[in-house]
Regions:
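Active-site beta-strand termini and strand-to-loop segments that position acidic
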Residues: 50-53, 121-124, 134
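Vicinal oxygen chelate
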Residues: 23-28, 78-128
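A short acidic/small-residue loop/turn micro-motif
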Residues: 44, 114, 135-138
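N-terminal beta-strand motif that seeds the catalytic metal site of vicinal oxygen chelate
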Residues: 2-30, 82-85, 135-139
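Acetyl-CoA-dependent GNAT
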Residues: 70-71, 108, 133-135
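Conserved beta-strand in the GNAT
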Residues: 67, 130
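Core segments of cupin and vicinal oxygen chelate
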Residues: 10-14, 20-64
Length: 139
């Protein structure tokens, strides 16, 4: 196991929050995955539910999202890649401060929704990464 310098943040990423990718026809993709792989979801895609270690008493299960986006989406910008990974994190505000100090490119401002806070960074190969601090319960 590689132990990277963590600047007093014990855990940076706690799990995979989601896989997002561009599709020519997102609706058709969701229908195909529902029909052939049993991934029945909603308008956004499918959510895998699971229990987070150490948080077995959480009111709601944790989730990992699978979601096709329209191929013309600008959500993944400034990345030119047809996909984006979402990672679950703890203490997003502090983590983004540390990442900025480390020279990591921060994209946009933190956004907050009923299901958590979101921030974005770029990796060295131009992949946009979404960081998600879920609200209690993991959803």
């Amino acid at each position: 196991m590689i132990n990277y310098k963590t600047n007093n943040i014990v855990k940076r990423v706690t799990g995979l929050g989601g896989v997002f990718f561009k599709a020519k026809d997102p609706k058709k993709m969701k229908e195909w995955y529902a029909t052939h792989l049993g991934m029945n979801g909603d308008e956004y895609g499918f959510s895998f539910q699971w229990k987070e270690l150490g948080k077995e008493d959480a009111k709601e299960p944790a989730v990992t999202a699978w979601s096709p986006f329209d191929e013309k989406t600008k959500y993944f910008e400034p990345s030119e890649k047809p996909y984006m990974f979402n990672y679950r994190v703890e203490n997003l505000v502090e983590l983004l401060k540390v990442l900025k100090e480390e020279g990591v490119q921060i994209v946009g401002e933190i956004q907050e929704y009923p299901y958590g806070k979101f921030g974005w960074i770029m990796d060295p190969e131009g992949n946009k990464i979404e960081l998600w601090e879920p609200k209690d319960g993991g959803v």
